[in-house]
Curated annotation (Swiss-Prot):
UniProt organism field: Ilyobacter polytropus (strain ATCC 51220 / DSM 2926 / LMG 16218 / CuHBu1)
Marked site: Important for acyl-CoA specificity: E111
Active site: C142 (acyl-thioester intermediate), H235 (proton acceptor), E237
Protein family according to the UniProt entry: Belongs to the MetA family.
Protein's cellular compartments: Cytoplasm
Top-level class of the enzyme under EC nomenclature: transferase
Gene Ontology terms describing biological process: L-methionine biosynthetic process from homoserine via O-succinyl-L-homoserine and cystathionine
Domain of life: Bacteria
Disulfide pairings: none
A GO term, aspect molecular function: homoserine O-acetyltransferase activity
Pathway the protein acts in: Amino-acid biosynthesis; L-methionine biosynthesis via de novo pathway; O-acetyl-L-homoserine from L-homoserine: step 1/1
GO cellular component: cytoplasm
Name by which UniProt lists this protein: Homoserine O-acetyltransferase 1
Length: 302
């Protein structure tokens, strides 16, 4: 089944060219199907890139998905055109009286800030509070996962000695849980972050379950036991060249940056990256949509 997005959204033609089933709203409305309503709070600077990455994964399931893109009202993006934001994005004020099957809160390159110092922190708190009653299941990604753990459970983030940067191996702790159904015993995830959360802080919260961890990158996948909240410290949605772009961007700016680990062939930046995480990315999003959202949400959203 398709993902339902506006035909003029840049991701529409990109995904259609990849043979991902996309459908415009006029065609979707002619079908007698209740689509899953998913809202994406996009906090990343380049919103078009991020929305395309996420829609690619959401569009590869048997379920019809209707997407709402959300931006912050209290902070204006400097890397995405105002025309794009006006055409395709809503604010929390527009949706606060609605209910959704799923919510995705993306990462944001603001790890150096305390949560309370983030320009849109109060607005983000409103969205996370809204998710308790108006969303069936929420997926938090990278900084979004740290923000969610902090807001809901008071779990702080800590700076790392060096940037966690590259593709890292993770071990599954519970092969029977549905969110990782079909996963291999070990799987690879891209990471790009300067902060982390501590295992002990998560273990002190009975509602939380650690599902996957890396010896080198730390905790990767955490969920509430009712799967209402999923927290992912990495970026399974990343494309082949995303870390490459970050690496050369930082080099061009004269920043001290290590070569991303386990990413370029032979660890040589002159070689192409090797994609080793794509299958598990699709599987995680498919499992989330099926087991945490579709199987749990009411047919009629109130």
């Amino acid at each position: 089944m398709p993902i339902v997005i506006p035909k003029k959204l840049p991701a529409f033609d990109t995904l259609k060219g990849e043979n991902i089933f996309v459908m415009n709203k006029s065609r979707a409305f002619s079908q007698d199907i209740r689509p899953l309503k998913i809202v994406i709070l996009n906090l990343m600077p380049n919103k078009i890139v991020t929305e395309t990455q996420l829609l690619r994964l959401l569009g590869n399931t048997p379920l019809q998905i209707e997407i709402t893109l959300l931006k912050t009202r209290t902070y204006a993006s400097k890397n995405t055109s105002q025309d794009h934001l006006t055409s395709f994005y809503k604010t929390f004020e527009d949706i606060k009286n609605h209910t959704f099957d799923g919510l995705i809160i993306t990462g944001a390159p603001i790890e150096h800030l305390q949560f309370e110092d983030v320009d849109y922190w109060e607005e983000l708190k409103e969205v996370m509070e809204f998710s308790k009653s108006n969303v069936t299941s929420t997926m938090h990604i990278c900084w979004g996962s740290q923000a969610g753990l902090y807001y809901h459970y008071g779990i702080p983030k800590f700076p790392t000695d060096k940037k966690i940067f590259g593709i890292f191996k993770h071990k599954i702790f519970n092969l029977k849980t549905k969110i990782t159904r079909g996963f291999d015993d070990e799987f690879l995830v891209p990471h790009s972050r300067h902060t982390t959360v501590m295992r002990g802080d998560i273990e002190n919260v009975p509602e939380l379950e650690i599902l996957a961890e890396s010896e080198d990158a730390g905790i990767c996948l955490v969920a509430t036991r009712d799967r209402k909240h999923i927290f992912i410290s990495g970026h399974l949605e990343y494309e082949k060249d995303t870390l490459k772009s970050e690496y050369f961007r930082d080099l061009d700016k004269g920043r001290s940056i290590d070569i991303p680990k386990n990413y370029f062939k032979d660890d040589n930046p002159e070689n192409d990256p090797v994609v080793t995480w794509r299958a598990h990315a699709h599987l995680l999003f498919s499992n989330w949509l099926n087991y945490c959202v579709y199987q749990e949400t009411p047919y009629i959203l109130k």
